């Protein structure tokens, strides 16, 4: 018997995010090919009203 899935240990040693070309933040997801900060490669920059300071 083992605790949990053995495959999950193989996922941990890879990079999930790298530096984004557009915004420069370390938020570009390598697997989904999308930046969680600016939304690259979408043509419009990602911005939400709830994310801005009041």
From Swiss-Prot:
Domain of life: Archaea
Keyword line: Metal-binding, Ribonucleoprotein, Ribosomal protein, RNA-binding, rRNA-binding, Zinc, Zinc-finger
Disulfide bonds: none
InterPro entries xref list: Ribosomal_eL37 (IPR001569), Ribosomal_eL37/eL43 (IPR011331), Ribosomal_eL37_CS (IPR018267), Ribosomal_zn-bd (IPR011332)
Listed name of the protein: Large ribosomal subunit protein eL37
One Gene Ontology term, aspect cellular component: cytosolic large ribosomal subunit
Source organism per UniProt: Thermoplasma volcanium (strain ATCC 51530 / DSM 4299 / JCM 9571 / NBRC 15438 / GSS1)
Ribosomal protein as UniProt keyword: yes
Listed GO MF terms: rRNA binding; structural constituent of ribosome; zinc ion binding
């Amino acid at each position: 018997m083992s605790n949990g899935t053995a495959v999950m240990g193989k996922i941990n040693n890879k990079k999930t995010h790298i530096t984004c070309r557009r915004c420069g933040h370390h938020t570009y997801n390598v697997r989904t090919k999308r930046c969680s900060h600016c939304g690259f490669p979408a043509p419009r920059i990602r911005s939400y009203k709830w994310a801005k300071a009041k």
